[in-house]
């Protein structure tokens, strides 16, 4: 299976956790790629504060580790995979904070990246927490497989964050802005 993610100016070796001698599954999906390509079009300052939700194996965290990154996930395996992939790519962990879904979110966030979870109650909890810390200057990009984005998903985004737009689908994934 492919373990090399090459997009824009990003070259990463990514593995699922635990790492196996023969990987059977890829550690990122087309939604990760779509998010990374979309963020590449933004002007992101060096010390930007990036908040990432539900980064399964660390593709987004590794891609933006040079910024002040806080990664929020309810999965211990995700936490372990993020640490493993940061080490695998010899990336600094100094500006990366990994926390669970119950911890308080940081203030003054410049960019929020959300991998939309399948559980709507988790998404609602995360959006409710997020609504208290984002400002009008915060850029929010959420992504998932197009088949996993429903009217109820969009309704939650609009309830907590205001008007939302969706992108065209690419590689069967879609973004919400």
Segments and roles (model prediction):
Residues 1-46, 56-60:
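S-adenosyl-L-methionine
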Residues 68-74, 142:
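Conserved SAM-binding motif I beta-strand of class I
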Residues 90-102:
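Conserved SAM-binding strand-loop segment of SAM-dependent methyltransferases
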Residues 123-139:
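A short glycine-rich, Lys/Arg-flanked "PGG" loop and its adjoining helix->strand segment in the class I
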Residues 82-85:
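Conserved SAM-binding loop
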Residues 1-20, 144-177:
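Non-catalytic substrate-recognition/targeting regions of SAM-dependent transferases
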